[in-house]
Amino acid sequence: MEIILKEDIVNLGYKNDIVNVKSGYGRNYLIPTGKAIIASPSAKKMLAEDLKQRAHKLEKIKKDAEALAAKLEGVSLTIATKVSSTGTIFGSVSNIQIAEALAKLGHEIDRKIIVVKDAVKEVGNYKAIVKLHKEVSVEIPFEVVAE
């Protein structure tokens, strides 16, 4: 029996795979629990169209991320914070302050996709990575100065 999986199933296949299973396993378990549907010609055609649309959508998202990466490429930030007499920062500079500095420049970036490698606790130059897509990321230099 040929079926189309609706979710990942261990030792059988991944979502949207067309697999052959024994009739009893398909009819009595996979189809009633909603984990699969029968791979009829119309279902195969719908699956192909769905995969085509999904690929097109993912390609558009990647292009948008690459366009934003090109805009962010030349950006460098200056973040002013309160500093002690020894040059250490009260607290630290995190992705929240970097997102706010980018917002002031007109780039609304979610703070969750900004990664700062090391803890920023002193005045100086650092780099943050903005992960716009799983294949597209931008390194943004920023300088921490005394307020």
From Swiss-Prot:
Top-rank taxon: Bacteria
InterPro entries referenced in this protein's UniProt entry, alphabetically: Ribosomal_bL9, Ribosomal_bL9/RNase_H1_N, Ribosomal_bL9_bac/chp, Ribosomal_bL9_C, Ribosomal_bL9_C_sf, Ribosomal_bL9_N, Ribosomal_bL9_N_sf
Q: Which UniProt keywords apply?
A: Ribonucleoprotein, Ribosomal protein, RNA-binding, rRNA-binding
HAMAP family, alphabetized: Ribosomal_bL9
Q: Which PANTHER family match?
A: 50S RIBOSOMAL PROTEIN L9 (PTHR21368)
The record ties this protein, via NCBIfam families, to: L9
**UniProt similarity note:** Belongs to the bacterial ribosomal protein bL9 family.
The entry's protein name is Large ribosomal subunit protein bL9
